[in-house]
Amino acid sequence: MDLRILSVNIGRARVIGTVHGEDVLSGIDKKAMVGDTAFVGALGINGDEQADLTVHGGVDKAVYAYPSENWPWWVTEKGIACRPATFGENLTLEGADENDVAIGDRFRWETPCSKSASRARPATSSACTPGVPMRRS
């Protein structure tokens, strides 16, 4: 498998909307790092924040990756223009999708090594992301 990192994305948690009158705090609004080195620790990438630590972050969910191979479906089926970090991912990948990666798989890019620890579930904050429908599994 030739898995490539297209983009490393980070963001700060902020209020992105309201649901049932309550502010929704989210770290979904990430931007691509440009010209910097990403330092990845046990709890994620330096400079990145997660808002709801009950479903994001921690040692088993420190970095969220999303395959660019899924973009054509979003464009065709939902009319959503995709770019790196559209779905709040820390790593925008190319060369494999969720069918090619299993929990426990390890990936190495130059020095760092990453392990697939769990499958992500959509966060409540996805409901506040413009143009991205919320899905529950």
Go through each PLM region and give its residues.
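Electropositive, beta-rich accessory/interaction domains or terminal extensions
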Residues: 1-128, 134
